[in-house]
Amino acid sequence: MKVLLVNGSPHSKGCTYTGLLEIQKTLKEEHVDSEIFQIGNKPISGCIACGACSKLKKCAINDTVNEFLKLAKEADGFIFGSPVHYAGATGAITSFMDRAFFTALCSNSDVFYLKPAACITSARRAGTTATFDQMNKYFSLSEMPIISSRYWNMIHGNSPEDVKKDLEGLQIMRVLARNMAWFLRCKEAAIELGIAYPKKEARERTNFIQ
């Protein structure tokens, strides 16, 4: 079992990374492999609505999004992390997730289907709950079980050293990791018992005015 931990911060070893690192340590204790995927600090284009992904089965913009999607095929679960920028996720992680999830949708890929997911947010002070809500939208649109902790998944601090003082925030990260590991074991056991996946329905697409 392996969980991909996506760092949506431009800082590879900053506050968001510190939260993901706490998750990674706990997953290791639970005998679950993980990998921290850095989206980096280079500009990431938003979706240009070209529709090429439906034919190419990957994004037409060949960058870190396609690198992630290759890894995602083999991953069993996902945790995305973002610092708060103006009470929302960063522009980079928003563009990244827009394109990754839209590519999976348009290419009819099962890369995210019924794989557990969660997000964490990092801020000096506020905006975490709005960011948390924003990032969870991707999972609920993709039939992904959302893993929760004992509080909204947020850490606070203006530096990694500050985050390490946020004892409750770090505990939230550990509880989240254990809940993710437990769900993965439950899913694995269900598959071994031959419990079938839910019946799929063809997607209906309607406009609100019709």
Where would I find each of the regions flagged by the language model?
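Cysteine-cluster motifs in flexible loop/terminal segments that predominantly coordinate metals
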Residues: 42-72, 204-210
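A short beta-strand-loop structural module common to alpha/beta enzyme folds
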Residues: 32-42
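Generic secondary-structure signature for well-ordered alpha-helical cores
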Residues: 25-32, 98-105, 140-144, 175-190
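Glycine-rich phosphate/pyrophosphate-binding loop and the adjoining helix
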Residues: 145-210
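Helix-loop-strand module that forms the ligand-binding subsite of alpha/beta enzymes
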Residues: 60-151
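N-terminal beta1-alpha1 ligand-phosphate binding loop
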Residues: 2-30
